[in-house]
Structure formats: structure tokens, C-alpha cells
Amino acid sequence: MTSLSLSPAAGPQRSAAAPKAVAVWLLVCAGMVFAMAIIGAITRLTESGLSITEWKPVTGALPPLSEAQWLAEFEKYRQIPEYQLLKRGMSLEEFKGIYFWEWLHRLWGRLIGVVFLLPFVWFWVRGQVSRALAPTLAGLFLLGGLQGFIGWFMVQSGLTERTDVSHYRLALHLGMAFLIYAALLKVALGLLDPAPAPQPAAGRLRPHAWAALALLGVTIVWGAFVAGINAGFAYNTWPLMGGTLAPAEMWTQTPVWLNLLENTAAVQFVHRWLAVVTALVVLSLCWQAWRTGGGTRLRGVAAGLAAATVAQVGLGIATLLSVVWIPLATAHQGGALVLTGLLVWTLHLLRPPETPRQATPLTATPLTEMPAPR
């Protein structure tokens, strides 16, 4: 019997190059998602998110191009509670400043969609995406579209009765961004390094790494709560809050559990101590990776992860002490993305060996010629 491949990329050189090309494209997309999260942080911190009051996925790509168009957009903004209660008297030039960040945030999201979709179609047509990988990539594209809808769902919450967006919807929007970013990295790493070298004590370190990533995710969600209800301004000292570890005003709302989600003092308290616990778990993971004699790459990633963890804690404290200075707060969100990426990389290096397959990840499954009938 002989094998016959349906893939145009079946030649040895193209089949070897295809995974790398697809992986590089996915890493570019992950980098764009990273930049998107940074732009989103600036948009939120400058209170620019409600400056565009309509959702026009196609025609909204262009900003106002004439004075009349600017005045029309400004008039729409003047109808919402944020302007009427908090920004009354804002000039047109000031409005243009906040409009820029929200417009850039939305434009960058559109660009990510284009940069993902067009190469995806190109790789697929050329046979460089396997049947196993195609649904994963299609799912990532759909997640990106869902993220755009979630963004508008979040903005909508601040256009009628509120002067800001729902912090629950903000957390959903931020969490989805981190999920897409982590998924892009995971798939890219799987293509670049489909069979990482076995690591000593990987079976013990893997649950530890998953626990660290889960804790980081919960800490990020509470960070979004802190941002959404301006809890970062409640107490700007460290480690005490108003001279005590746990201020009494943490428990002023009923039912009691609601304080953990909506009370500014309690939300900041939870984020602070979740961050401490997460940092300790991550640093413990890094120490264990070194102590068990992991390979050079695992040790290198663990060292970077430890350094990034210490830096992130420092950025969080500095953000508090600076009363949420925008450059520091933006860097703090970037630090969370770096930690996420390094933990995804760590988990990739710790993953169990896979059963060998007959087909390579990015080539079509070979067909077997049927014997001619006698």
C-alpha cells in the first residue's frame, strides 16, 4: 500500500515550515491582543469608554472628519448621564481627547479581526491548517467576535442610568481578553514545540501551575472590580488600609457577601490579599521548578516568572501609593498579561508526552489507496 496526501503542503520542506508560519501568525495576534488590553486600560483610566454612544462595527471605523460631524458626536455624548452629572461644561477639544482612545480601542479590535481572519483563510486554502486545528482557530475567531459584542454590552450599561459601566461587565470583557490571549499563546506554543522535553516532577508541578493560573485569573477579575467601582482610590496606603488591615467599612452592605463584590473597601481588600496569595503560590512554583532540576528552558521561564511576579506586586503597590497614576496602572495591567503568558508557557513545558500520531499537526490525514478490484 502507498500513502496519498490531500495536502498541498505535503512536501517535507513546506510541511516543516507550515507549523512555524502559523505559530508566528498566532503570536502576532497574541501581541495585538496584548496591545488591545493596554489600550483598553488607558481608555478606562482616562474615562473615555462612554465617549462613543453607538455601535457601528463597519461604518464606525472612521472618526468624525468635519466640524459638523464632531459636533454631532459631542451632542450624543451630552445626552448621557456621565456628561450631565460628571462632565458638564466639557469643551469640544476635551471631548476629542477622550473620543480618540475609545475610537482607537474599537479600531484596534477591528484590525485584530482582519489580521486573524485573512491569514487563517490563506493558510486553510493552502492546506497548512489540519482538520484538527481548523475548529480551534475558527473557535478563536468566534471568541473575538463575541468579545466585540461583550465590549458593546459593557458600554451599553453606562449609557442610560449609570455614570459608568457595570463592573461585572467590565470584568467579563477583561476576562475574555485574557482568555483569548492565553489561548492564542497555547496554540502557538503547541505548534512551535509540539513535543517539549520531559521534565522531572512534571506530574507534581503541573497541578501547582494550574492552581497558580487559576488564582491569577481570580485576582485579575477582582482587579477589574477594583477598576470598575474606583476602589483603587479608597485606600492609598500599604500594607494597612486606614491604619488597619481590615477596615470596619468593609461590611456595611447587606447581604454580607455583597460587600466582596460591590463595597469599595472590601473589593480592594480582596484584590490585595488575593494578589499576595497568588504571588506566594507562583514563587513557590518557580522554586520547585528550580529545586527539582528542571531543564534549561523550564528554569529560564521559572526565573522570568519569578521576576515578573515580584515586579507585578511592586507595580500594584506603586499604583495604590500613587493614587492610581495612569502610567503605573496601565503597566500593572500589562504585568498581569506577562504573568499569564509565562504561566501558559510553564504549563506547556510541563505537559505530559502525547501519543505519537501518524500525521503531522498541520498536514492533512493521509489516505490509503484502495486495491484495484480483481
From Swiss-Prot:
The protein's Enzyme Commission number: 1.17.99.9
One Pfam family linked to the record: COX15-CtaA
Pathway this chain belongs to: Porphyrin-containing compound metabolism; heme A biosynthesis; heme A from heme O: step 1/1
GO biological process, any: heme A biosynthetic process
InterPro entries referenced in this protein's UniProt entry, alphabetically: COX15/CtaA_fam, HemeA_Synthase_type2
Membrane spanning residue stretches: 22-42, 107-127, 135-155, 172-192, 209-229, 265-285, 306-326, 327-347
Reported function: Catalyzes the conversion of heme O to heme A by two successive hydroxylations of the methyl group at C8. The first hydroxylation forms heme I, the second hydroxylation results in an unstable dihydroxymethyl group, which spontaneously dehydrates, resulting in the formyl group of heme A.
Protein name in UniProt: Heme A synthase
Organism: Rhodospirillum centenum (strain ATCC 51521 / SW)
